[in-house]
């Protein structure tokens, strides 16, 4: 008698990662595993400590390790950009990749930081759009912010950085309406700014205290309607935001950017577009040891 039993192929459980060094501080596993549980999905999201010397080999072995994609954090974002087989327009403009996924055998990359920045402000301050933005810092994080602001149609984006040459390089890359303003004359732009953004690490836990105390922003010259935001989220309320609050200005912390930027990758790997909720924020705040929220 012929055996007609058909063996069903066991469905693979999607596995994703966050890779960087150091990686122990990353909140990404908490975020993605919260969503996996919330939506009752089978899947894994794992932190991977990988050095710069090991990173290329790690990427070439993703499928063998059972990964369908993942997040890339410091110091690997630019290397991921160079190694991905395909980069979308967002990643190309920002010059870094923080989200990877497969399309067939092709390793694809994007950068979700610009989306995370805009979505955070959409969520926390829906009327945040204006004409003039003042951005402090010209590092990797600033590139995503400039991209987001340009996409949202700001008519003037003033970039301020201690090393003016770095700011000039970014302004040339992004073109109009990005322009460079002198670090010590930033106060002259403040009274015009509808949005003020800090993309530097000044005020971050473990940052240089001398540098922190020398960083200033004369908020008493700012529009009363201006919105102030900091992409740093440890501490949740940075000295930059504290000073803005002291002058009665509206502020948005940087935690929401982290939460919202995670949405795009989760949807790629696990097939559902998750929502950033108060419950998720509370979970991450608890993990951070923060009581605010």
UniProtKB/Swiss-Prot annotation:
Residues that, per the record, bind shikimate: 26-28, 73, 98, 113, 233
Annotated keywords: Amino-acid biosynthesis, Aromatic amino acid biosynthesis, NADP, Oxidoreductase
Pfam families: SDH_C, Shikimate_DH, Shikimate_dh_N
Residue positions of the active site: 77
Single GO BP term: amino acid biosynthetic process
Catalytic reaction list: shikimate + NADP(+) = 3-dehydroshikimate + NADPH + H(+)
Gene Ontology molecular-function annotations: NADP binding; shikimate 3-dehydrogenase (NADP+) activity
Positions contributing to NADP(+) binding: 89, 137-141, 161-166, 231, 254
Pathways per UniProt: Metabolic intermediate biosynthesis; chorismate biosynthesis; chorismate from D-erythrose 4-phosphate and phosphoenolpyruvate: step 4/7
SUPFAM superfamilies: Aminoacid dehydrogenase-like, N-terminal domain, NAD(P)-binding Rossmann-fold domains
EC number per UniProt: 1.1.1.25
Gene Ontology CC annotation, any one: cytosol
Function summary: Involved in the biosynthesis of the chorismate, which leads to the biosynthesis of aromatic amino acids. Catalyzes the reversible NADPH linked reduction of 3-dehydroshikimate (DHSA) to yield shikimate (SA).
Family: Belongs to the shikimate dehydrogenase family.
NCBIfam families: aroE, PRK00258.1-4
Subunit description: Homodimer.
Protein name as catalogued: Shikimate dehydrogenase (NADP(+))
Species annotation: Bartonella henselae (strain ATCC 49882 / DSM 28221 / CCUG 30454 / Houston 1) (Rochalimaea henselae)
């Amino acid at each position: 008698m012929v055996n007609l039993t058909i063996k069903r192929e066991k469905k693979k459980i999607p596995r994703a990662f966050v890779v960087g060094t150091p990686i122990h501080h990353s909140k990404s596993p908490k975020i993605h595993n919260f969503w996996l549980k919330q939506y009752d999905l089978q899947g894994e999201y794992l932190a991977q400590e990988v050095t710069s010397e090991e990173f290329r080999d790690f990427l070439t072995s993703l499928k063998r390790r059972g990964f369908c994609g993942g997040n890339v954090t410091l110091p690997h974002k630019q290397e991921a950009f160079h190694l991905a087989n395909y980069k979308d327009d967002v990643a190309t403009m920002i010059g870094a990749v923080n989200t990877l996924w497969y399309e067939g055998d092709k390793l694809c990359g994007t950068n979700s930081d610009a989306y995370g920045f805009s979505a955070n402000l959409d969520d926390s301050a829906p009327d945040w759009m204006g004409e003039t933005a003042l951005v402090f810092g010209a590092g990797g994080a600033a590139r995503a912010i400039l991209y987001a602001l340009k996409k949202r149609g700001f008519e003037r984006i003033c970039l301020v950085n201690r090393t003016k040459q770095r700011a000039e390089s970014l302004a040339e890359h992004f073109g109009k309406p990005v322009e460079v303003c002198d670090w010590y004359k930033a106060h002259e732009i403040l009274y015009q700014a509808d949005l003020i953004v800090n993309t530097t690490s000044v005020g971050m836990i473990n940052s240089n205290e001398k540098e922190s105390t020398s960083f200033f922003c004369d908020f008493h010259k700012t529009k009363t309607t201006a919105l102030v935001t900091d992409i740093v989220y440890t501490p949740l309320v940075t000295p930059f935001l504290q000073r803005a609050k002291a002058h009665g200005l509206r502020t948005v912390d940087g935690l929401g950017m982290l939460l919202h930027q995670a949405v795009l990758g989760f949807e790629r790997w696990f097939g559902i577009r998750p929502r950033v909720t108060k419950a998720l924020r509370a979970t991450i705040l608890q993990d951070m040891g923060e009581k605010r929220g």
